[in-house]
A protein has these predicted regions:
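Bacterial N-terminal signal peptides that target proteins for export
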Residues: 1-8
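Residue-level hotspots at or immediately adjacent to binding/recognition sites across diverse folds
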Residues: 22-363
């Protein structure tokens, strides 16, 4: 959230568990690193060896300057390096191919950075660096290689939103019409998923601390509304860690309290009316959950430091599936996806449901 000390606390406290011997919906892969991984991005690319059939390319990032890439569905991972970046904490990554990706680091001031590669990670261009000590980036999302947005904690009581429309220059959005942040309110840089940009107009992000709120803009960030959710709140360690919206404007939020990661009260909430009203899940996940991804219409998967769940009813009931220590997740479709977590943990999604057909359309 608002300081490097806070980020370090989150990192240390979420390293408390290790992977079990058995996983049901997730197949553990060998990453070659033992650092804490915080973000994952996957994309289909045409395979020239298979007449252009789509194959997944997966990128992941985390602490100690670690950036990983796999072009063979996670069987092998290549470690990539940013010049002078070995001490950076890369909490966000967005990929477009085996060649092009953005990576975002967190920290106070100039430790918050955005880099881009166009040569598969051989070199990285620094596009943004925090120009004042109050800057603390939390997450990055993209609609395309040229149109992306990054969220940062409040500067002068307004959340920082950076945007690029050319894939090169990042500029802050005007904040005159944004509601002020509450004292101590911020966003969690836990899984690169507290910000959503489903199209070029709609923007949503979730917060934590004194309140677990969802800010929403329907005009590209020019004007904003804000709504309080029933997710656990009131402590600097509690609030919304992940936010997602589907094609029908149903919004799901997940969170918890990283100082009490086993707390399962008020972890998940859903809005079926585009964020206007919120309902707590009837059956909650089993503790802090930091990552969320759409499987298919009404079906979602949640990951966290103490386990994973799926829901098949828009987040009303969550069913435990695994007990891996995962931080972030991304699915490409109903059968293909990856999650990353503590101690270099990487797991591939294995859909065990017999009733979920078709292709997901994550937003």
């Amino acid at each position: 959230m608002t300081s490097s000390k806070f980020a370090v606390c989150v990192l240390l406290l979420l390293l408390f568990s290790s992977a079990p011997a058995e996983a049901n919906w997730w197949k553990v892969q060998t990453s070659g690193t033992d650092t804490n991984l915080r973000a994952v991005s996957a994309v289909y690319v045409p395979d020239a060896k298979a007449n252009g059939a789509p194959v997944p390319v997966v990128w992941a990032s985390g602490s100690n300057g670690v950036i990983l890439k796999s072009v063979d569905e996670g069987k092998n991972w290549t470690r990539l390096h940013v010049t002078d970046g070995d001490s950076l904490d890369f909490r966000g990554i967005v990929a477009f191919s085996a060649s092009t990706a953005y990576v975002m680091s967190i920290g106070d001031g100039d430790k918050s950075r955005i880099y881009k590669t166009a040569d598969g990670g051989a070199t990285w261009k620094l596009q943004y660096s925090g120009d004042r000590k109050e800057v603390f980036l939390d997450t990055i999302v993209c609609l395309s290689e040229k149109e992306c947005m990054a969220l940062g904690d409040p500067v002068e009581r307004k959340f920082l939103l950076l945007k690029t429309t050319d894939g090169e220059q990042w500029n802050p959005l005007p904040t005159g019409n944004m509601p002020v942040a509450l004292p101590g309110e911020g966003a969690f840089a836990a899984s690169n998923s507290c910000l959503a940009m489903p199209d070029d107009k709609k923007v949503l992000f979730g917060t934590g601390g004194p309140a677990a709120r969802v800010f929403q803009s329907n005009d590209g960030g020019l004007t904003w509304t804000v709504a309080r959710t029933p997710v656990v709140q009131g402590n600097p360690s509690s609030g919304i860690f992940s936010l997602r919206i589907d094609a029908h404007d149903r919004v799901l939020v997940l969170g918890g309290d990283y100082k009490e990661p086993a707390l399962s009260d008020r972890v998940a909430a859903t809005s079926l009316d585009n964020g206007k009203t919120w309902q707590l899940a009837v059956k909650q996940p089993g503790g802090l959950r930091s990552g969320l991804a759409l499987i298919d219409n009404g079906d979602w998967v949640a990951v966290g430091p103490s386990g994973e769940e799926v829901t098949e009813d828009y987040g009303a009931h969550w069913k435990h599936t695994d007990s891996l220590n995962l931080n972030a997740v991304e699915l490409l479709d109903t059968q293909t996806g990856w999650a990353v977590g503590a101690h270099g943990l990487i797991a591939r999604f294995v859909n065990r449901s017999k009733r979920i057909p078709g292709i997901a359309r994550p937003r």
